[in-house]
Structures are given as structure tokens and as C-alpha cells.
Amino acid sequence: MYNPYQQPSYGAPQQPQQTGYGFNATGGNAMPQSQFQSTGYYQQQPTYQQPGFQPQQTGFQPQATGYSVPQTSYQTGFQVQQTGFQPQQTGFQQQSAETNTELKIPNIRLSFITASDQSKFEHLFRTAVRKGETAISGDAARDILLRSGLPPVTLAEIWSLSDTNKSGSLLFPEFALSLHLCNLALKSEPLPSVLPEKWSNEVQSFVDAISFSVPEDPSKILANTPFASLGTEEKTSWMDAPAAPSTSFQPQLTGFQPPQMPAQRTGGQITAQRTGGGSLIPLQPQQTAGLVPAGLQRQNTGYQPPQPLQSQNTGFQSSVGRQNTGYQPPLQQQGTGYQPLKQQNTGYQPPLQQQGTGYQPPLQQQGTGYQPPLQQQGTGYQPLQSQGTGFQSQGTIQPQGTGFQPQSTGFQPQPTGLSSQPTGKPGQWGFVSTPTGGIPGLSAMEQHFLPNTQLSSNNLQNAMGGSLKTNVTWAITKQEKSIYDGIFQAWDKSRQGFIDGETAIGIFGKSGLARPDLETIWNLADGDNKGKLNKDEFSVAMHLVYRRLNGFDLPLRLPPELIPPSKKHIQESMDSLKNSLRGGNNKPKRTQTSSSLYKHDDDDVGYVSTARHRKKSDSSSGSGSGTMSIEQLKKEIREKKILLDAMDSEDRDSSVLSQRDREWNEREIESLKFRILQAHNKLESSGISGSHEEKVQLLDRLRHLTQDKMPKLISNIHVVNNEICSRQMKVAKLRLQKEHPDWAPEASDADIVGTGPNGEVTDYDRKKFKSKQLLKRRMAALSGAKTGSTDTAVDDQLAKATEDAKNLGDQQRKMIEEISGSIKDLEDGCISALQSTTREDSYEKWEKGQGVSSDVAAFIRSLPKSEGSKNGRNEKTQSPYTQPTKSQSQSAQSTQSQSQSTQSVQTQPAQPATYSSYSSPEDRAAYIKAQAEKRMNERLAKLGITRRKETGSKAPEVPKEPVEAPKPQEIETPKETETQRETNTKSTSQTSKAEPQKVSVPPAIPSSSQAPAIPSPAIPPAPEDDSEDEEYAALMKQKQEMEERRLRKKKEKEERLARLKREMEEMNKEEDSDEEPVTSVPTYTNGSVKSSTQPISQSEEVPKTEEEKSGESEQTASKPEATPTEQAPKPDLVSTSAQSKANPFSKNNNPFFKPTQTPTIDPKKAAAQRDSQRGLGSDDWSDSDDNSSDDDGPNRAGAARLASMLFGGMAPPPRAPTIEKEETGSKETAEVPPPTEVAPPPVPAAPPASVPPPISAASSKETDSDDEWGTPSAEAANDHDDFDFGNNFEPSMAPSPPPVPTQHIPEPVTDVPPIPQSIPPPPQSFAATVEDAPPPPPIPSQVPPPPPPPPSLFPTESSNAPPAPPPPPPPSAPSAVPPPPPMAPAAPPSAPAPSPGGPPGGAPNIGALLGQITGGKSLKKVDDSQKRIADGATVGRVVD
């Protein structure tokens, strides 16, 4: 068949083709493969030749253009004609079973594939694609790709790159791309991970071109047309035809004709058709398969349209006037159509008979003879209007001299009388015939709109302007589309697929149209208002420009023919999706139906709701239920029973499954509860879960200290430091003036009076001062007066002193800044540890059970929260590091200064502890404060500043792990064990007591009455009668003494540490040898915290045996010359451990006080006492300091204060030097024999007459006393937070109490006030201020009575101990006043004056104080190694 849109080049090799139907003798349909071309009906006969026909050369190669019937005996037609073209295949001849000649592939070149490769790929593609399909299936493509021998992984990558649409099949451009990638892989070239943009754009354009060229279904074309009935009758013909036509022409037998056309008369009437494209559009050659010539791509059909065809004789050229081009006379009649066609005679018959050349049933028979005035006839089943197929005198071909009327051979344009119309639906581009006559200027438009052309718009308008055609539609033809696409690709150089608005305006502006027209065109093209145009939208705009240049009016709306297919497809998809969603979610309203109403055909729509069928089935079942028979009803009943049984079975199964699920869920819940409980217990045991409120309180307290209090302190320190510098410079100047009376110092910068803000010296002040000095010198030079100093040495000394003072001030300032930085670091660390990471709502939800279900809340409340806190309390009760509660901490602030002065022995923790090792918030807070204080004191130590507190030689005490106390029965030991322990202790003490004699003792510090106190950095004002040089000498001497004392303390610290290590080893050996279980290893803890694990009761009766009393008397009598220093620390060494106090037979190294019963403990009182013992101040900071240089020596001021409190009513101790006291004590202590251990006698009942002195006075004095457990005085409270720049207290040692006599108990003193029947309650809180304390009692004028037994003073209500024994008898009157300390049982001396270290309120009640000391449960036992007196490190300290 000839396609008018295919134009091959001359000499191009073409494949043979056959475009007609071949009939055999029986009328059957056959498609043989012929190698030659025949121009009419002929049969090949090897023996018979027609004499009148000679072959002629027409420049074309032979080509079969009609129905060729293979015969083996004769030929009746024409001779073979050479047409100049090689045989070619046009898609209508099946050369082999594998080649799909019907497949239409656009003639588009892929730039990345060579032309030869693309032709090979196309041939391979045609052989693999079945007829009726346009894409190769995945299986077929897989088989082809596997032939390359590549691994499957590589082929899978190639497939993913080639299948651009992800459809599972490949169109030709995708198939060619896959083969090209295979070639690259075979050449060992790497495959691209993503297709290059150029390749992707070309392949996508090729795919779009194939999608646009898909023909329409003939059934859809015939729908709603008068030819619909004819189309349905010939469905078999459509099925039998090689391909479906889409033009208005039927196959003709006399020329190159499209398939599926009914045969025409082959005699004298040949329908003219357009076969070469005419003079309209020169088309490029291309191969198609069974598609129409009007709107399809061009194909090579053999003839070249530009070459004018010469007329040729197609009949007999002899004398025969006319010939039959059908069958020759010797042949029998045959059917030239399908089987139902009637036979016709094709021999020589002057009056030729009519023969059917088309489809017989619908067509009327036509005469094949000579009929000049032939009428137009319908040539096939088509939706188009009929066209004239008779003789039309047109074209350039000369009429043939065959006896027939001249006719066109089909190579000229169609008659202009036919109206061109689109053959597809509106909006489907490329299926529109070019308007007859054409619209001019298309080629000029293509050249005008290219990017590099600079042509005037007048040239373009002159090329346009053809006469308006009324039969021209808005549809875009293939030729126009190709031109528009070429312009688009020329402008879209980056291959983005879009042209922006600016570029489009420049392109459209070349047309010379008015601005309103261009705006209208843009609005019509860019319907989505994107601001840019894709290829289809650009084609629409260019088409509108083209039509407007030809005089057409622009439409107000975009015609349906111009709607881009891509946009239409997207819109249709969106509409269908919306309809499906609307129909699926929203049920249509039920409308009243009636049989009289018009019913829509459901087959017309693509989506049919299932609700319609459901409605029909419901109505049918409802209507038929009334007419069901009995058998049907029984059947329904049986079916319903079966359904009910099935439902019951399902219910049972579901119930079983649900029961299993419930059981499984319950097990899971229990398992989770158990895991939660384990985690909770783990958290409680580790102590990680601190209270949120406690953390908030501690954090607030920390911020108050660091943000409010600390900045003020630092500011005050800076002020004092500046004042010290200025005073030092003034003192140096005055000293030099006194030493050199004739020396007149020159005014220095310090004499400049500043006039700036805050008295600052400005530049103006300096200039003014210099000018004054210069003027003064000049005046002195004129008058000869003396202007300044002539002694340069003195000036140098002054400058040096001034510089030293400034340097010292700078150093102090830097130290303060370092301390401030350390405080900031400590603050950050504390804040990070105290900041709560738990949200408040989460805490309320998971800790208190708020906002959760009742079951979860009940489980949360059932968690053992109290157990963790109870364990924490027990641990804190047993731990020697117990921290006070908030109220106790506040109450203990007022007693810190007293405890600082009385506690001096500090021990070292056995193991280093960390923050995470403490289980309670109090312990962690204590650890944080201990670390903070340690760092603070490190900074303060550099300045020589120490806070007024107890001194020690170890690091700040931190809490340690609690130690469980053994049971009472484990503590009780027989007397033999106790005796053995005493023996071991004596030997150890003798060894340890001899050691201090070898240790160098620092020189005695002058007492407060003999030596001035160590001055602070601020130099005190000198007395008026003292000279300046004496003040300076005293200052330098004090400074030198301070430095020497620091060196001594450092050396003493090292020696003391070594001695303590030795003592520790000895004690460990001693305790290892004991059979009694030891409750805790003696450790050196901070003196600010007691080491007891049990609370301390307010009173405890500790009676002494007669043997002990006699031993004490002997010991005292043998040492009449003993100094008070020997026995001063004994009240402090009375302490015993809690376990020993609970055991009446436990060993105690103190011969004075041995417990005989287990007292009742009051936790609140014990906590208050521990607070005071720890030395907690008002700011909750501990007083322990490891690196303070002033902590190395003994707190002699504390010892003096303790001695004054204990023995204020006795004779004042002698002012002996400390060295002598220590030496004497050392010697005398070594000579003291150990007391004999005697079993204690039974406790007698306390007689009512034996009453101690009144307690009221003691309790009143206790408020103002300076003891360890009492409320501090006003001076002590005020001195609590002060910084001490030296030990300013008198280092006098406190005397020990007199021993209890062993004689008979005398009659009670009659003038003693009666004792109250009930003991007044001890103070529950130590927060009482000094104002609340009662006034001190007057100094007694008579000799005070002997102290009663302390245990009888503080019995508790819950105490189950036996009544207290009677007090010991008073000693007999001595012959003379005993030497101090009065230890003999003589009459008490006269009332002495209060000692300087005593409290301002007078002598305290010694009995009450001794009762509290002996009642302390936290005092541990002390071996002989620590009972020595000469050691300065333990003087006046309470041993923990």
C-alpha cells in the first residue's frame, strides 16, 4: 500500500510489499510473498504471454500494488514494470511469522544511538512484538536481553533504567535504550545510575509520540453515527483485515492502496486518491503498519512525490481499445473479494458484466465497463462522508491510452470537494487531515521563530494571510506539531521540558501580534497559571499564533481540539478518582423509582456501584419470599440453622481465644508488675531516686548562698583588701618619716585628690597635680627653700614599700577571683546534681498515681515507697554520718561555734566515697557540701584565712556506708575477755605514750594575757603612746610568727599522720586479737560529725564501783603535782561506742565512767545533739577543712573554752607553758598504773534524801553555757561565720573533774535547794536566740556541793532502767587548799573568780554538763594510745 506521507530517497533499498488482497481460485483469502510488483490483477502463467503488452521502464522497481493471486501456469496481466525503487515492505505483507509489519514506529532519531543500530533494534523489536500491540512484553524482552550473556544483576539494572514508565513492558525507544545499555555493558563501560537528562528527554519524547499515534477503536468511531449498523454487520471483516483503517478510503486494486478497502471496479473506473502528498507538505519517509495516510507518519511506498509521474498504459497497447484489468479470457470466473461475493466474468466481453469488487452484502454491484459519467460511490465503511471515486481530471499524470477515460492513478491530491474532518476525538492530536488547500506560511513560521533568526515580522505576516477556510478546524496536525516541537526544542537548550514566561514572551513577540492578542494566547495556553509552558502548551500557543497570523479570530475558550492530551488525561484521571471516592464514601440518596421513568443504561459508564446490585437482590429476595414453596422454606430453614450453628461455633472459638488472650494479658501484666517492682527496689536500694521536693529545697538554698550571700562577701573582701593596701602604704610612709625626721617625702600619686565619679583620679587631676609640683619646685629654687627629700634611699624604700603593698593587694585580689571562680564551679556542679530532670506532671502521674487508671494508681500506691525511706532512715540512724533534717539543720546553726571549739580530733574515712555511693538525699547533700567546703577552704588557705572552727588534719568528712550494729547478745562478753582486752590496751597505750616524747613540740603560743593576738591583714590603729616604729616591729614580728606557725603546723601534720597510721595498725591488731565482735573499725572522722550510730539520750546513769573509785583516789593521791593539763581531756575521753554502752560488761578504757545499763534513746534529742556536734552553721556548710594551714595545730582556744565551762568554779589553772605541760603530762601518764577490773556491785535503789543540786539553775545556765550540746551564747553565735586570721585564744588546758571519793556517803547538804520531781525537757530545737535565754545566775558565794551522779539527771519517760543510785559522798575537808587542780577529796575550795575563757553568764552547772557528756551514746571508746595528754593534736578535742 502506498502511504502519501512517506517519501523515500532515490535509490534507497526498499523491501518488497504487497498492499492488496490475493484471491485464489476458490475465492479464499491469501497473503503470499511476491517479489515483484503488479499494477493490476494478474495471474502468473509460465507458458502463456499476452502479445500486446511490453514492459516499460518508469523508474520504479516492481511492487505489488493489487491483489496478487499466485498461479503456476500462466500470466494474464501486464508485464513487469521497473519503477526505480527497490522492493520494500510497507506493513501490509507478512514476510515472516516473526515480523510485525503493522507496528507503527515514529521516524525519530535517538542521538545516543547510531542510525544502523537503531534500524537493527527496530527490526528486532518488530520481530518480538505481536500484532495489535505496541510494546514488547517483559518475558519477550527478558529472552532477548539474556542473549547478551550479561549477568542477571546487570540486566535488572538495565531494565530499571529502560522501563521509564514502570509498566512492565517496553515501547520501542525504551527497548532501544535497553539494547544500547547492553552494548555499553558488553564493552565493560559502567552503567549510569541515573539516565542522563538528554537521553531521558529524548526517550520520553519518543514515547509521547508513540502514545499520540495510537489509533482509535473503529467501534468508538462508528458510535453515534448513521454507519453504526453497517459497522456491526462487518465485524468479521474488521477482524479478518490486517489492520484497522482510520481514513475515509477503502482499498483499491489499481494502485498503491491502503488495506481493508472494498475492491473497486477494475475496468474503466478508478477512484482517485491522494497517494503522494500532493503539493501541500513534503513528508519524510517512514514505515507504518496498516494506518491511514492522512494523519499518520510518512512511510516509504516506492514513489517519490517530487518526481512527476509519467502516464503509462496499464492495459493492452495493441489495437485493443480497452482492456479488462481483471482476469483474462482463458481463466475461469473467480471471486475477487471474500467468499460471499458473487463470481464475475473477467474474459473478453464487449458488454462487460458487472462484478462485485467490494464487500458484497452492503455494496451495490457496479458496472466495470466504460461509464464516463460515473457517479460518486461509497468506498467502504467509514464515519466520514462519501467522496468521489470516479474520474477526476486533476494532477499532472497524462491519461493512459487504454480505451478508458483518463483517470488519476492515485498519486495526486484529493479532490477539493471533499471536506476534511478529524478522524479522532477532540483533543487527540495528530489524527487530523491537513485542510484541503492548506494554510500558507507554515514553513516560513518555522524559520521565523528559531532562536538565531532575526527576521522582520512583516515578512512573516506577508507569508500568511491566505484566504480564510470555513472548513478548517482548530486541531493541530502532525506536521504542525512537529514544527512546534522543533521550535520548542530549539529554545529549550537545557532540556528541562519547560520554557519560562520571559523566553515565551520573546518568542511570541517575534510574531508582531498586538499585546492584547498575545495576552489572550498566553491565558489560553497557560490554563493552570504556572508561569511556564511545557511542550504541549507551547504547541497550543504557537498554533494560536499561527492561526491569528492567518486572520482567524482567537477563541474565548480553548477549543476541545487544542486541549493537550497530557492535561486531558490527568484531568480525566482526577475526575475518575474523585467520582470513585465520592461514590465509595457517600452513599447516593435513595430516590423513588418508577417503572414509567426512563432507566439509564448502566453499561454506558465505567463505574457501577455495588449498591445497585445489592438493591436489586434485596428487592428480588423480598418479593420472592412471599411466593416461596414449602420445600424452599424448609431449605431456607436448614440453611439458617447451619448458619446459626456456624455462628455458635465461631462464638465458642472466639470465647476460648478471648479467654486465652485475657490469661496471657494477665500473665504479661503480672510479669510487668514484677519487673517494675524489681526496678523500683533497685532504685530504692541504690538511692538514686531522691525526693523532688528535697532537691528543690536544696537548690533554692544553694542559689541563696551563691547568688545572694557570696557576692556580698566577696565585695566586702575586696573593700577590706583595698583598705589594707592603703593602710600599709601609709604605715610605711609614717615609719620612714619617724626614722628620718629630716626626710620630707615628695607628693606621690597617692596624694592626688580625685574629682571624678566615686573619687576616681582623672587625667585632669594628674595634670593639675604635676603643674602644682612644678610650680612648687620653681618657687623653692627662687627662694632657696627645701622642696623635697634629699635622701634618695628613703625615697626608694618608700617606693618599694608602696610597690610591695600594691603587689600584695593584687595577689589577694587574684586569690579572691580564683575563689570566686571555684565557687562558680562548685555551684555548677551542685546545680547539675540537684536539678530535677523529672517533669512535674510525670512525677505526679507515676509517683502519686494521678491521671492514670484506678488499677495503675492502686499498683503505684502499693509500691514499697515507705520501705525505701524507712531503710534510708535506718541507715541514717546507724550511720556515723547521719545528716540532720531541715528543722534540725536550722536549729543546729546556733551551736556550730561551740562545737567547733570543743571537737578537735578528726579521723579519716576508711574508704573514699563518691556521690553515687550514697543512698539518701541527706547523704548526697552532705557530700556536696563537704566537697564545696573543701574547695573553698583550699582557696581561703592561700590567704592565711580560716573560718572559726575546729581544726583537724584530714579531709572534710563525708558520709559513708552504714554499718549494722551487732545484736546485744553478741556484744556481751565474759569478764575474762574484758580483762584480756584491758591488758592488751595497757601495753599498747604504754608504747604509744612514749612516742610523743620524741616528737618535736612547737613553742608555746603566748596566752591572750601575755602576747598580742595575731593581727588580721587590716592593721589595727596604734595606741597613742606607742611610736610608729614599735607598731611596725610588732607587725613584722606577728607576720614572722604566723609564717613560722604555718611551717610548724605543716610539719606537725606530717608527723601526726604518720603517728595516726601507726596507732591505727596497733588498734587493728588489738581488735583482731579480741574475741568480742567489733561493731566498727575505729576511723578518723571529721570532728564536726559524731560517729555514733544510735541517738543520744538526755541522761544515763553510770555508777562506779568501789574498786574504781578507790583506784581513782589512789591515782589522784599519787599525783598531787599533776597539772590540769594532765586530766583536761578526760571528760572528752569518756565517750564509748553505742554497742559498748548497750553492754554492761563491755570493755571501756575510761576508769571514771562505765555504763551499766542500756538507756532509752530519744531520736529527736539525739538528732539535735548530732547537729551541734557536726558544727553545722546557719549556712549549712560543714566546718571541716583538709587543706587549711591553720587546721594542723590543736584548737587551743576550744580547749580553753571547754576548761572554763567545765571547771569555772575551781581555782584558775596555772599559766604554765604548753611544752612543759605536755612533757609533764607525758611523764605522769606513763606512770599511771591501770585500774583493776572489779565486777560492779548491784545497783542500789536511790534514796529520796540523796538528791542532786537543783536542776533549775543548771538548766538556766545550760542555755548560756559554752558546752558542746548547749545553745550558744550571743558571742558564739555572732562569731560563727567570722573568718579567723589566727588562733587568738588562750591555750590553757581545761582541768579534769575531781574523782569521786570512796568513803561513806555523807549527809546531804541542808541548804541545797530541793530537786524537782521531774526533769525539765531538754531543748528540742537549738534555734532559740540569745534573747530567749534566761539571765545568768549570780556567782555562788559558798562552796558548791559535789556533783551528783550524772545519770540520775536526765531519765526519760520510756526508760526501763533501774532507779539511779545515791550520789557519792562529798569529800572530807582537807587541811589546806589543794594545789590546782584540786583533785583530793578535801573540802571544796572557796568560790573562784570566773576564768577568762568561761561564758559571760558565769560558771555553768557542771553536773548538768557531765550528765550530758556521760549520756552521749555517740562517744566511742578510747584506748591508751589516745589518752595521752602531751600530744598537741588532741588537746581539748572530743574523740568520736
Curated annotation (Swiss-Prot):
Residues 1-67, 234-285, 297-428, 564-629, 861-1440 are annotated as: Disordered. Residues 1232-1255, 1311-1324, 1333-1353, 1362-1402 have a biased composition (Pro residues). GO terms for molecular function: actin binding; calcium ion binding. Gene3D superfamilies: EF-hand (1.10.238.10). Residues 1405-1422 form the WH2 domain. It is a peripheral membrane protein. It holds the Pfam family DUF1720. GO terms for cellular component: actin cortical patch; endosome membrane; plasma membrane. Residues 1-21, 245-257, 297-384, 399-423, 573-583, 985-994, 1080-1100 have a biased composition (Polar residues). GO terms for biological process: endocytosis; endosomal transport. Residues 117-206, 480-569 form the EH domain. Residues 627-686, 1024-1076 form a coiled coil. Belongs to the PAN1 family. Component of the PAN1 actin cytoskeleton-regulatory complex required for the internalization of endosomes during actin-coupled endocytosis. The complex links the site of endocytosis to the cell membrane-associated actin cytoskeleton. Mediates uptake of external molecules and vacuolar degradation of plasma membrane proteins. Plays a role in the proper organization of the cell membrane-associated actin cytoskeleton and promotes its destabilization. This is Actin cytoskeleton-regulatory complex protein PAN1. The lineage of its organism: Eukaryota, Fungi, Dikarya, Ascomycota, Saccharomycotina.
